[in-house]
Amino acid sequence: VGLAGHVRPDGDCVGSTVGLYNYIISNYDKQVQIYLEEFSKDFLFLHDADKISHTPTDQVYDLCIAVDCGDKERQGDFLPIFEHAKHTMCVDHHISNPGFGEVCYVDAEACSAAEALYKLVEQDKINKNAAEALYMGIVHDTGVFKHSNTTKSAMSIAGDLIEKGANPSFIIDETFYKKTFVANK
């Protein structure tokens, strides 16, 4: 299984792809590889984020899932991986998504791709590693729950991810406030 996110990956893109990676490897006997452009080192605390490939490959996957991509071109240099896969899927939350891939799951009501993924998978199979990554995705696309896309659903899901092991203060401090403090020095 290949996973690809959008160009210039943000916290939701990284959190969603790493969350899905951890969900798949902990529940299914599948080989999985994430493909993303370079991203903020602040996100490397996520379990297995260091295994992400930043280089395209010629490998043909049985399945490639585009995560947090409003259209297929948003995969940038990793689009050929998606196009050459035997089967394709898109998981997204952008209302502008035209629907691409054999299977396309777009939840325009979701605050983030992380929330859309949470709703798509079996929640009782989400482990601590996946919970931390998905929580980071929600936190980033809601601006630490300040943006107008912060909904009751997003807050409820964030609460469930905390129960599954996500550490909110660590994730927020590592990816928001640590950066802000250093920038203000």
Please describe what each predicted stretch is:
Residues 13-18, 76-78, 151:
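Conserved strand-to-helix beginnings and helix N-cap segments that scaffold or border functional pockets
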Residues 1, 7, 19-25, 98-185:
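A structured phosphate/pyrophosphate-recognition subdomain
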Residues 9, 13, 69-71, 95, ...:
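Short, glycine/acidic-enriched loop or turn micro-motifs at the edges of active sites
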Residues 35-37, 67, 91-93, 108, ...:
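Generic beta-sheet signal
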Residues 32-34, 88, 134:
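Hydrophobic/aromatic residues located in beta-strands of well-ordered beta-sheets
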Residues 10, 20, 43, 65, ...:
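Divalent metal-coordination and catalytic microenvironments
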Residues 47-49, 53-103:
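Active-site cofactor/cluster-binding pocket
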Residues 2-59:
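Anionic-ligand anchoring segments at beta-strand to alpha-helix junctions in alpha/beta enzyme folds, i.e.
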